[in-house]
Amino acid sequence: MNSQVIIFDTTLRDGEQALQASLSVKQKLQIALSLENAGIDIIEVGFPISSPGDFKSVQTISKNIKNSRICSLARCLNKDIDTAAEAMSSSNTFRIHIFLATSTLHMESKLKKNFDQIIDMAISSVKRALRYTDDVEFSCEDASRTTMDNLCRIVEQLIKAGVKTINIPDTVGYTVPNELSTIIHNLFKRVPNIDQSIISVHCHNDLGMAVGNSISAIQAGARQIEGTINGIGERAGNTALEEVIMAIKVREDILGVSTNIKHKEIYRTSQIISQICNLPIPPNKAIVGSNAFAHSSGIHQDGVLKNRKNYEIMEPSSIGLKEVKLNLTSRSGRAAVKYYMTQMGYKECDYNIDELYTSFLKLADKKGQVFDYDLEALAFINMQQEESEYFSLSFFSVQSISNGLSTASVKLLCGKKVSIESATTSNGPIDAIYQALNRITNFPITLQKYQLVAKGKGRDALGQVDILVEYKKRKFHGVGLATDIIESSAQAMVNVLNNIWKANQVNEKLKTLKKVNN
């Protein structure tokens, strides 16, 4: 049996379902590029039929990813399959991932079909997908609650039809490891043409066993694991791929398999996705949590100092976790900043050096010395900025008055031409600034979430503000970064206003296209 395990990442499709606000095309591309850089084999980049935005994201990513294989999801509907193929048409090689429920519960209560009809739908859709690519994956939704007889029957027919990858999802995270292992064993035992296809598993974490189930499936013969970085996903999440990958590496003696993953890119990829998705990593998270390599017990600390292997089964450097000693000040030049960015794993194409250096100098003037975590935070904000933002904050001031009230004055540059000023008194400085900015744009928004996170150490640490607003029943996310909390809060709101403005522009273009087509 092949000892290579294919890693299938669905952060951009299944993982995005956990987010309160959709990611922009640029953010999705950043994630896809980081996954490609980490050596991910298959990147499921979206569900193109679901929205024009998802279609555009898949289309854009397909044009830019060269080393990983692109994959899109489709239901057993011709329009889904055709749209998926169209969105990925610029890629030399791509996969179409079709799914259909096979459990009795889903067939009777959701689909209102019998099993013969399910097989006919599945085979018809596979034939449709094979018109576009020879790489077709089929997922038997709710496979872990499908009868073994039915599962074996449909898998055999799918392989005969030309499916190269059969996915066995534990859709609701119901299975336990030995149960999933038995399912995989039975498929290998009872399906005569099973050797003509790769068996994959897609485990959810509702009972906290997604990683354990995935490992047991590997031991039973599965050779593709589906999941997300940091385990993000709806409900309790998906299989955390970084945990499976490192389990395979550390316990190769037991599992006897390997992956194509560049292990030293794991930590950076995890951090990028955490920041872009605005989903903080718990400190005790395996592999990538801030406490994963921390030792507080005196006995443990003494043991680690004598020999790290006493209490560490892997080195921090094995996932790319290393401390970069920075000594940057306002006298440091562009070359020094570029050098340290390279040391931290960034490529020159990842960021705009002119904009990053300008932000660096402003911070260096305030703090004196810039540390690695400062530069990392600045780089993240730099990478989020679009080439041309419609709104930009040119001035703000806040004055606190009696009874907890504050007055804010702002000047907003609109379209790089028109400068508009506004002033408002409200409860607290941040709300006053938000009210003043909203007076200018007149967007009917409601603030739903405000989060402040320190990016660094000490009193002069950078503060990152993440906000979530609702605008016309849609959620929009914004982020700002500064040593001053009020300034970072203002930047976050301007970021939101730009995101809303861009969404409105897209909607206007779609309306125009519909009128032309009609």
UniProtKB/Swiss-Prot annotation:
GO biological process: L-leucine biosynthetic process
Compartments where found: Cytoplasm
Catalytic activity, as annotated: 3-methyl-2-oxobutanoate + acetyl-CoA + H2O = (2S)-2-isopropylmalate + CoA + H(+)
InterPro entries cross-referenced by the UniProt entry: 2-IPM_HCS-like (IPR050073), 2-isopropylmalate_synth_dimer (IPR013709), AIPM/Hcit_synth_CS (IPR002034), Aldolase_TIM (IPR013785), LeuA/HCS_post-cat (IPR054691), LeuA_allosteric_dom_sf (IPR036230), LeuA_bact_synth (IPR005671), PYR_CT (IPR000891)
Record-linked PROSITE patterns: AIPM_HOMOCIT_SYNTH_1, AIPM_HOMOCIT_SYNTH_2, PYR_CT
Cofactor(s) required for function per UniProt: Mn(2+)
Residues at which Mn(2+) binds: D14, H202, H204, N238
Region (Regulatory domain): 392-518
Gene Ontology MF terms: 2-isopropylmalate synthase activity; acetyl-CoA C-acetyltransferase activity; manganese ion binding
Coiled coil: none
EC number(s) stated in the UniProt entry for this protein: 2.3.3.13
Similarity comment text for this entry: Belongs to the alpha-IPM synthase/homocitrate synthase family. LeuA type 1 subfamily.
Pathway membership: Amino-acid biosynthesis; L-leucine biosynthesis; L-leucine from 3-methyl-2-oxobutanoate: step 1/4
HAMAP family listed in its UniProt record: LeuA_type1
UniProtKB keywords: Amino-acid biosynthesis, Branched-chain amino acid biosynthesis, Cytoplasm, Leucine biosynthesis, Manganese, Metal-binding, Plasmid, Transferase
Stored PANTHER family: 2-ISOPROPYLMALATE SYNTHASE 1, CHLOROPLASTIC-RELATED (PTHR10277:SF9), HOMOCITRATE SYNTHASE-RELATED (PTHR10277)
UniProt protein name: 2-isopropylmalate synthase
Species name: Buchnera aphidicola subsp. Schizaphis graminum (strain Sg)
